[in-house]
Regions:
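Acidic, proline/glycine-rich low-complexity intrinsically disordered segments
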Residues: 2, 6-7, 11-357, 361-386, ...
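Generic surface-pattern signal
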Residues: 169, 173, 198, 401-404, ...
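Acidic, Ser/Thr-rich low-complexity linear motifs
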Residues: 178-180, 243, 340, 405-423
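A generic structural signal for well-ordered alpha-helical surface patches
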Residues: 377, 394-397, 429
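TPR/TPR-like (Sel1-like) alpha-helical repeat modules
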Residues: 384-407
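Terminal, low-structured helical/coil segments at or just beyond the last alpha-helical repeat
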Residues: 409-443
Length: 443
């Protein structure tokens, strides 16, 4: 889908946003050329972009308000990204209805990227095509098509803009990280670190990204986004059991999160990161309002929905958790870390004795990332409950090969996933018996 891609583009760009105050900018008047020095080629600012008015392919004046609304909302959403420089709506609309080359627009407005698209409505169906273009080279960096039932146009407009924004965040960061830089600054290293985190997680990738964020902080100790991303990474490394020094990582993550919030109290990323640190400290009840605040500040922050859903689950609100995971998956279906979201949906369904749905989600998670031990363990229980002992035993062996936590049921039962009495009762009726049938020892 088109919007997830676009959203991806801007998500990575988000790293740059934190160091560079976002603002709308109008084209600047050229300065008088000096006759005493050679003229240097103009280089557009990083993360500078114009959202061109989307084309109304049906040529129906009655639909112009919807088409223009998409353009205006995207302009507003992208401008919230710290570090972005978004051309103001009034300037962008001077290109409405005109066929102008993206490279020419880049020169005229001084931007690196052009987002363009079209909307066609037929009856109750709406098709939206969008693409991100490198204004310096004319290359297409990302494109996607979005087909939806018109239904509530206002809700559709919100959905579309959120998904595009999310996609653009990642794509812009990736694009910026690939540009050669003679003298990299803090922002360059932040973008490089963000680009690394768009790939499937591993100990090596965490280490690589951490090194880049550390370099950014060394260059600029006041870089809010560098502090925030490093804190998020340290907390995630602990949660994913990929930290050699978990206590030290958590203590430092806590300090960095506090630093980021002090420097930028209205930062969606900073609130999300504080939630991540609290989650890593097994303080889900305190993390929930931080995730909710992050979402209120940035409705496209898909990981915040997923983590909020997981905290709802861990605190006993099992039914309430599902819509948050569904929204996260809907906003960012190509998220690099989407496998745990699929897996936790499977966990919830298994605990609800919905084995077929559970296995479906767990297999989706496994196809995205085959190294998640909890996914294999829940698959073992699911297949055992379905009467497939051979597959159940195979999945249990996979889980045991990935984590020592699955060599006895007593060890599994110690997980903080089952601290809540409601969750433990559900597990005792479904998951634990399934593991027994799969062959896990009691002790």
């Amino acid at each position: 889908m088109l919007f997830p891609a676009v959203l991806a583009v801007i998500a990575v760009a988000g790293a740059a946003w934190w160091l560079w105050p976002g603002r709308h900018s109008e084209p600047q008047q050229p300065q008088a050329e000096s006759t005493s020095a050679p003229v240097q080629p103009y280089s557009a600012p990083r993360l500078s972009i114009v959202v061109l008015p989307f084309a109304n392919l049906r040529d129906d004046p009655q639909q112009e308000y919807f088409v223009d609304g998409i353009t205006e909302d995207l302009t507003t959403d992208l401008a919230r990204i710290e570090g972005s420089q978004v051309i103001a709506r009034n300037t962008a609309f001077t290109y409405k209805g005109k066929s102008v080359d993206a490279k020419r627009i880049g020169r005229e407005l001084g931007v690196r990227y052009v987002l363009e698209g079209s909307i066609q409505r037929s009856g109750n169906q709406v098709r939206i095509n969008t693409q991100l273009v490198d204004a310096e080279t004319g290359a297409h960096l990302w494109a996607e098509r979005f087909d939806r039932d018109a239904g509530d146009l206002f809700a559709l407009q919100n959905e579309i803009t959120a998904r595009i924004a999310r996609a653009l965040q990642s794509q812009l960061a990736i694009a910026e990280s690939r540009r050669p830089t003679a003298r990299p600054d803090a922002l360059d290293y932040i973008l490089r670190g963000r680009a690394v985190l768009t790939k499937p997680i591993s100990r090596e990738r965490y280490d690589e990204a951490a090194s880049l964020f550390e370099t950014a902080l060394a260059l600029d100790p006041q870089a809010t986004d560098a502090a925030a991303w490093l804190a998020a990474l340290l907390a995630a490394r602990v949660v994913d059991d990929l930290s050699d020094l978990p206590n030290e990582d958590l203590h430092r993550a806590e300090r960095l999160a506090a630093q980021a919030l002090a420097m930028s109290p209205s930062s969606a990323l900073a609130h999300y990161v504080k939630g991540q640190v609290l989650f890593a400290q097994s303080r889900c009840k305190e993390a929930i309002p931080e995730y909710e605040r992050a979402i209120s500040l940035d409705r496209s922050r898909a990981p915040a929905y997923a983590r909020l859903g997981f905290c709802k689950f861990l605190t006993g609100s099992v039914e309430d958790a599902i819509p948050y995971f569904e929204q996260a998956i809907h906003l960012s279906p190509h998220e690099p870390g989407i496998a745990p979201w699929f897996g936790r949906m499977g966990v919830i369904y298994l605990l609800q004795s919905r084995s077929d749905e559970a296995i479906g989600w767990l297999e989706k998670a496994n196809s995205e990332n085959a190294r998640l031990a909890f996914v294999h363990a829940y698959l073992a229980a699911g297949y055992a409950l379905k009467g497939d002992p051979e597959r159940a035993r195979a999945e249990l062996r996979e889980a045991q090969g990935l984590s020592n936590a699955y060599f006895s049921l007593a060890s599994v039962e110690k997980s903080n996933w089952y601290d809540n009495p409601k969750i433990r009762a559900l597990a005792e009726a479904t998951y634990f018996p399934g593991l027994r049938r799969a062959g896990i020892p009691e002790e």
